[in-house]
């Protein structure tokens, strides 16, 4: 999410931006825990109500924020927002399915590698250059992924890790699609993403013959994932991101990856495997290294990104 382009504010305030982005990461980190608390609903039902709640929230927010200019915002966002939304729907779907088939820590650590997939897609489709530092960090992250997925595959598992990779690629596709039109507001892309995810979920529900009826508590949990875990987290991030540098956003957003497994560990006792710890350490180390050393350029130091 930290690649969202927007207008830089005239008077950025780090004292405001830091707590907002940290809080956004905490909201995002709650997804794994909430999913584990769901009792009977299938992954497709969770995806349906999670994405539906987010879509309804965005409809309301777009009308409040843009009023009569809402149509113009969608027109200006154009095809990149639609393609980005499709990628985001793939990411939403992959994330929920990953939580169903693997540990929360595994899913989140693999999602943390999304910036490296973004770099590869940016090079392939936009001709963006990849620095030697980024290549080196990508190799370290790839080693981390191999440690995590290799251990699971050796045990005859690994489906959840593949879904997490799908989610990471989806988020990367969103970032690259938005780069094709600098300054694009991310709201239309998330609008389309949540709508497409509802459609994906509807197909999954139809094929699995699970229906739309869930228990009230599962409905509450699923909807809260859309309203609070994604929705409120995104709104906090977009406000806070206007006041921070790209490197700060990258590092502060890691609260999601760190807090997510800890929450599940403390509340329900889901302990990550040794392979997940080792692989996650390599991935997080690569991200921190790239963020800190990559911030040595004047542009990275001086320009807040949102």
Regions of interest found by a model, annotated:
Residues 2, 40-90, 117-118, 170-174, ...:
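Transmembrane alpha-helices of multi-pass small-molecule transport proteins
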Residues 2-48, 86, 94, 143, ...:
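Glycine-/small-residue-enriched transmembrane alpha-helix faces in small-molecule transporters
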Residues 13-17, 40-48, 72-78, 145, ...:
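Juxtamembrane helix-entry segments on the extracytoplasmic side of multipass membrane proteins
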Residues 18-21, 75-83, 129-141, 160-164, ...:
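Cytoplasmic-side transmembrane-helix entry/capping segments in multi-pass membrane proteins
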Residues 23-30, 34, 61, 82-97, ...:
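Hydrophobic alpha-helical transmembrane segments of multi-pass membrane transport proteins
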Residues 51, 150, 218, 254-306:
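C-terminal-most transmembrane helix of multi-pass membrane proteins
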Residues 58, 62, 88, 130-150, ...:
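Hydrophobic transmembrane alpha-helices of multi-pass small-molecule transport proteins
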Residues 60-62, 97, 114-136, 146, ...:
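C-terminal transmembrane-helix exit sites in multi-pass transporters
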